[in-house]
Amino acid sequence: MTLEELVACDNAAQKMQTVTAAVEELLVAAQRQDRLTVGVYESAKLMNVDPDSVVLCLLAIDEEEEDDIALQIHFTLIQSFCCDNDINIVRVSGMQRLAQLLGEPAETQGTTEARDLHCLLVTNPHTDAWKSHGLVEVASYCEESRGNNQWVPYISLQER
Protein backbone atom coordinates (compact mmCIF):
# COMPACT_ATOMS: atom_id res chain seq x y z
CA MET A 1 0.00 0.00 0.00
CA THR A 2 1.39 3.38 -0.98
CA LEU A 3 1.45 6.41 1.27
CA GLU A 4 -1.30 8.03 -0.82
CA GLU A 5 -3.53 4.97 -0.41
CA LEU A 6 -2.85 4.87 3.31
CA VAL A 7 -3.73 8.55 3.70
CA ALA A 8 -6.88 8.08 1.59
CA CYS A 9 -8.01 5.16 3.79
CA ASP A 10 -7.36 7.18 6.93
CA ASN A 11 -9.27 10.16 5.50
CA ALA A 12 -12.21 7.92 4.55
CA ALA A 13 -12.36 6.45 8.06
CA GLN A 14 -12.19 9.91 9.60
CA LYS A 15 -14.92 11.16 7.24
CA MET A 16 -17.12 8.21 8.22
CA GLN A 17 -16.66 9.01 11.92
CA THR A 18 -17.52 12.65 11.27
CA VAL A 19 -20.66 11.75 9.31
CA THR A 20 -21.75 9.20 11.91
CA ALA A 21 -21.38 11.79 14.67
CA ALA A 22 -23.29 14.30 12.51
CA VAL A 23 -26.16 11.82 12.01
CA GLU A 24 -26.32 11.16 15.74
CA GLU A 25 -26.30 14.89 16.52
CA LEU A 26 -28.93 15.54 13.86
CA LEU A 27 -31.28 12.84 15.12
CA VAL A 28 -31.14 14.08 18.70
CA ALA A 29 -31.66 17.71 17.62
CA ALA A 30 -34.48 16.82 15.22
CA GLN A 31 -36.31 14.81 17.86
CA ARG A 32 -35.89 17.57 20.42
CA GLN A 33 -37.34 20.10 17.95
CA ASP A 34 -40.15 17.80 16.81
CA ARG A 35 -38.69 17.49 13.30
CA LEU A 36 -38.41 13.70 13.30
CA THR A 37 -40.93 11.25 11.90
CA VAL A 38 -40.39 7.68 13.07
CA GLY A 39 -41.71 4.54 11.39
CA VAL A 40 -42.23 3.21 7.89
CA TYR A 41 -45.99 3.82 7.87
CA GLU A 42 -45.76 7.27 9.47
CA SER A 43 -43.00 8.25 7.04
CA ALA A 44 -45.01 7.11 4.03
CA LYS A 45 -47.98 9.17 5.23
CA LEU A 46 -45.84 12.29 5.66
CA MET A 47 -44.14 11.91 2.28
CA ASN A 48 -47.54 11.53 0.64
CA VAL A 49 -48.89 14.69 2.29
CA ASP A 50 -45.83 16.99 2.36
CA PRO A 51 -42.72 15.61 0.62
CA ASP A 52 -41.18 19.07 0.31
CA SER A 53 -40.74 19.31 4.07
CA VAL A 54 -38.53 16.20 4.20
CA VAL A 55 -34.79 16.92 4.06
CA LEU A 56 -33.36 13.52 5.01
CA CYS A 57 -34.49 9.91 5.06
CA LEU A 58 -32.68 7.33 7.17
CA LEU A 59 -33.38 3.69 6.43
CA ALA A 60 -32.21 1.60 9.36
CA ILE A 61 -31.68 -2.13 9.34
CA ASP A 62 -29.38 -4.60 11.01
CA GLU A 63 -27.79 -7.58 9.33
CA GLU A 64 -30.22 -10.10 10.83
CA GLU A 65 -33.15 -8.23 9.23
CA GLU A 66 -31.66 -8.11 5.72
CA ASP A 67 -33.76 -11.13 4.70
CA ASP A 68 -37.06 -9.45 5.61
CA ILE A 69 -38.63 -9.19 2.15
CA ALA A 70 -41.51 -6.95 3.26
CA LEU A 71 -39.07 -4.48 4.80
CA GLN A 72 -36.90 -4.51 1.68
CA ILE A 73 -39.97 -3.76 -0.46
CA HIS A 74 -40.86 -0.84 1.81
CA PHE A 75 -37.29 0.43 1.56
CA THR A 76 -37.30 0.17 -2.23
CA LEU A 77 -40.52 2.16 -2.47
CA ILE A 78 -39.32 4.78 0.01
CA GLN A 79 -35.96 5.11 -1.78
CA SER A 80 -37.72 5.57 -5.10
CA PHE A 81 -39.98 8.25 -3.67
CA CYS A 82 -37.01 10.01 -2.07
CA CYS A 83 -35.06 9.98 -5.33
CA ASP A 84 -38.04 11.39 -7.22
CA ASN A 85 -38.35 14.20 -4.66
CA ASP A 86 -34.64 15.00 -4.22
CA ILE A 87 -34.56 13.81 -0.62
CA ASN A 88 -31.19 12.67 0.71
CA ILE A 89 -31.17 9.03 1.81
CA VAL A 90 -28.77 7.22 4.13
CA ARG A 91 -28.81 3.52 5.03
CA VAL A 92 -27.96 2.95 8.67
CA SER A 93 -27.07 -0.10 10.71
CA GLY A 94 -26.93 -0.19 14.49
CA MET A 95 -30.55 -0.36 15.57
CA GLN A 96 -29.64 -0.57 19.26
CA ARG A 97 -27.62 2.64 19.08
CA LEU A 98 -30.44 4.26 17.15
CA ALA A 99 -32.93 3.26 19.85
CA GLN A 100 -30.54 4.57 22.48
CA LEU A 101 -30.18 7.93 20.69
CA LEU A 102 -33.94 8.31 20.43
CA GLY A 103 -34.48 7.46 24.08
CA GLU A 104 -36.26 4.18 23.55
CA PRO A 105 -36.69 2.31 26.83
CA ALA A 106 -34.28 -0.64 26.95
CA GLU A 107 -37.04 -3.01 28.04
CA THR A 108 -39.10 -2.37 24.88
CA GLN A 109 -36.23 -2.71 22.40
CA GLY A 110 -36.75 -5.76 20.23
CA THR A 111 -40.31 -6.31 21.46
CA THR A 112 -43.62 -5.71 19.75
CA GLU A 113 -44.06 -2.59 21.92
CA ALA A 114 -40.97 -0.91 20.46
CA ARG A 115 -41.39 1.89 17.92
CA ASP A 116 -40.59 1.05 14.32
CA LEU A 117 -37.18 2.67 13.84
CA HIS A 118 -36.62 1.33 10.32
CA CYS A 119 -37.46 4.62 8.63
CA LEU A 120 -36.74 8.06 10.04
CA LEU A 121 -37.50 11.33 8.30
CA VAL A 122 -35.98 14.63 9.27
CA THR A 123 -38.24 17.50 8.29
CA ASN A 124 -37.75 21.18 7.79
CA PRO A 125 -41.03 23.09 7.52
CA HIS A 126 -41.30 25.58 4.68
CA THR A 127 -41.71 28.46 7.10
CA ASP A 128 -38.42 27.74 8.82
CA ALA A 129 -34.92 27.63 7.43
CA TRP A 130 -33.55 25.31 10.13
CA LYS A 131 -29.94 24.46 9.54
CA SER A 132 -27.87 22.35 11.81
CA HIS A 133 -24.24 21.45 11.45
CA GLY A 134 -25.27 17.79 11.38
CA LEU A 135 -27.73 18.34 8.54
CA VAL A 136 -25.17 20.22 6.47
CA GLU A 137 -22.55 17.52 7.09
CA VAL A 138 -24.91 14.66 6.17
CA ALA A 139 -26.20 16.46 3.06
CA SER A 140 -22.61 17.04 1.95
CA TYR A 141 -21.80 13.35 2.49
CA CYS A 142 -24.85 12.31 0.46
CA GLU A 143 -23.89 14.63 -2.38
CA GLU A 144 -20.30 13.39 -2.33
CA SER A 145 -21.51 9.78 -2.36
CA ARG A 146 -23.78 10.42 -5.34
CA GLY A 147 -20.77 11.89 -7.12
CA ASN A 148 -19.07 8.52 -6.56
CA ASN A 149 -22.13 6.65 -7.91
CA GLN A 150 -23.17 5.48 -4.47
CA TRP A 151 -26.78 6.62 -4.53
CA VAL A 152 -27.66 5.43 -1.04
CA PRO A 153 -24.66 5.84 1.24
CA TYR A 154 -24.28 3.62 4.27
CA ILE A 155 -23.16 4.36 7.81
CA SER A 156 -22.89 2.20 10.89
CA LEU A 157 -23.88 3.52 14.30
CA GLN A 158 -21.63 2.01 16.95
CA GLU A 159 -22.97 1.05 20.36
CA ARG A 160 -21.51 2.92 23.29
Swiss-Prot record:
Output the GO biological process annotations, alphabetical, semicolon-separated. Answer: apoptotic process; cell differentiation; positive regulation of apoptotic process; positive regulation of JNK cascade; positive regulation of p38MAPK cascade; regulation of cell cycle
InterPro entries named among the record's database cross-references: GADD45, Ribosomal_eL30-like_sf, Ribosomal_eL8/eL30/eS12/Gad45
How does the annotation summarize its subunit structure? Interacts with GADD45GIP1.
Q: What is the designated name of this protein?
A: Growth arrest and DNA damage-inducible protein GADD45 beta
- For whether the record's keyword set contains rRNA processing, the answer is no
Q: Does the keyword Amino-acid biosynthesis apply?
A: no
- Name of the gene encoding the protein in the UniProt record: GADD45B
Q: Which family does it belong to?
A: Belongs to the GADD45 family.
Q: Which Pfam families match?
A: Ribosomal_L7Ae (PF01248)
Which UniProt keywords are given for this protein, alphabetically ordered?
Apoptosis, Developmental protein, Differentiation
**Role summary:** Involved in the regulation of growth and apoptosis. Mediates activation of stress-responsive MTK1/MEKK4 MAPKKK.
Which species?
Homo sapiens
Q: Which domain of life is it from?
A: Eukaryota
Question: A single GO CC term, please?
Answer: nucleus
